[in-house]
Amino acid sequence: MEQLSSANSLFALELFHTLSESSPTGNIFFSPFSISSALAMVFLGTKGTTAAQLSKTFHFDSVEDVHSRFQSLNAEVSKRGASHTLKLANRLYGEKTYNFLPEFLTSTQKMYGADLAPVDFQHASEDARKEINQWVKGQTEGKIPELLAVGVVDSMTKLVLVNAIYFKGMWEEKFMKQDTTDAPFRLNKKNTKSVKMMYQKKKFFFGYISDLKCKVLEMPYQGGELSMVILLPEDIEDESTGLKKIEEQITLEKLREWTKRENLENIDVHVKLPRFKIEESYILNSNLGRLGLQDLFNSSKADLSGMSGSRDLFISKIVHKAFVEVNEEGTEAAAATAGIATFCMLLPEEEFTADHPFIFFIRHNPTANVLFLGRVCSP
């Protein structure tokens, strides 16, 4: 499981960098876990160079028996009875006249719980699009009502592969609504906007990375299996959002080092965190292309013969939409598709005032998997 968590987290950071390059000062929010799961299903049906590129981009090449690892991980992450709601759902929508290989369909069902729903892309692509959107809307409690925009599928579409993830968690320590006030949020050195700033003082895991002048705060959700971890620079020191230095330095080893419990102290923290709601939509072809995944999107080069026995399939688009809302009660999120840090002595009480841009992720603690990763530049 650890190999797969590392592979997924490494991919998460690499994709974060490409999204940040495309939008240097914008909000970012996505589910690397959802994207990796969806492309692992594609990986089942790829061969040759296409398979090699996919394996390298997602670091599946460092994981033994990747599909059964995903099977265990998906089961572990979406265990029933937890005090949060975390739902994963996969489904394949295939052109009903097209012959997919039975062994491909058996494997996606067994490893990813993904059934094939036959639809009529050829003669009724708009109906098929609506059906897919309706399913995703149901899986994400209405938070992602339209995954596929008009025109994304057409009469030539053979396969749409959908992964949806939905999360709703209550803070272990809730903020009191009466403590929320209007406060300025600094977007950069010059501009501010007014936000609803929540406040509480409780014991939290807190750390400080001195070479980056950055605070680390872990806020657990009820049940303790999931946490939101926030990286907040002490101040805005660059001409942009103030996150440049962290973004340039962040690696998987460092992120683990900075955010693991042993390196944090459980102390009283005055937490000020804005309420925020982010909805992002990405077509990931060019971002994944920059990470080395190219043949998959090229009709003359893609080899998905493990799905159909022939070479006539390719993936035209990878669409990912994600939604997160953070308030006094907790968080609702959905998505469809090592230098050792030196920690310094902390005071008995610390201030954590998120009144300027920060990076955050939602982690499944038992498996150390990053389920969602984001950056708040303008709440």
From Swiss-Prot:
Gene Ontology biological process terms from the UniProt entry: cellular homeostasis; inflammatory response; negative regulation of cell migration; negative regulation of interleukin-1 beta production; regulation of innate immune response; regulation of protein catabolic process; type B pancreatic cell proliferation
Function according to Swiss-Prot or TrEMBL: Regulates the activity of the neutrophil proteases.
Designated name of the protein: Leukocyte elastase inhibitor A
Keyword Signal: no
Matches recorded under InterPro entries: Serpin_CS (IPR023795), Serpin_dom (IPR023796), Serpin_fam (IPR000215), Serpin_sf (IPR036186), Serpin_sf_1 (IPR042178), Serpin_sf_2 (IPR042185)
Gene Ontology MF term list: peptidase inhibitor activity; serine-type endopeptidase inhibitor activity
Subcellular location: Secreted; Cytoplasm; Cytolytic granule; Early endosome
Site feature (Reactive bond) residues: 344-345
Gene Ontology CC, one term: cytolytic granule
Modification sites for Phosphoserine: 300
Natural source organism: Rattus norvegicus (Rat)
Coiled-coil spans in chain: none
Keywords recorded for this protein, A-Z: Cytoplasm, Endosome, Lysosome, Phosphoprotein, Protease inhibitor, Secreted, Serine protease inhibitor
